Amino acid sequence: SKSASIVMLTELVERGQAKCAQYWPNDGILTFGDIEVEFLSVNESEDYSERDFKVSNRSDNNGSQLIVKQFHYHGWPEVGAPVSGYSMIELVEDVQKQQQNSGNHPIVI
């Protein structure tokens, strides 16, 4: 798939329990078998982070690469619901813009 958008709605750890493994580098490159994930940039807002990665398949002789944007939402409390839905609406708007700019491929959630 040529998904260019990832939406992550959980933290790595919540209430002392691991919820998600960090599959992205904070800097440089992480390698998973033939797949390389290279950190490009991060934009932090109050309730979510936008990270850009370059994903490459080292076994592909054509040098295929994909720029992927991850939207990591931090505004959802561990228990209950957010006080305001405004930041979630902002997140959805930013994801929609990304989708339009990247070819409207499936979103990984």
Swiss-Prot record:
Catalytic activity: O-phospho-L-tyrosyl-[protein] + H2O = L-tyrosyl-[protein] + phosphate
Binding sites annotated in the UniProt record for substrate: 78
GO MF annotation, one: protein tyrosine phosphatase activity
Enzyme class: hydrolase
EC number: 3.1.3.48
InterPro entries: Prot-tyrosine_phosphatase-like, Protein-Tyr_Phosphatase, PTP_cat
Annotated Tyrosine-protein phosphatase domain residues: 1-109
PROSITE patterns the UniProt entry points to: TYR_PHOSPHATASE_PTP (PS50055)
Family membership: Belongs to the protein-tyrosine phosphatase family.
Name assigned to this protein: Tyrosine-protein phosphatase 4
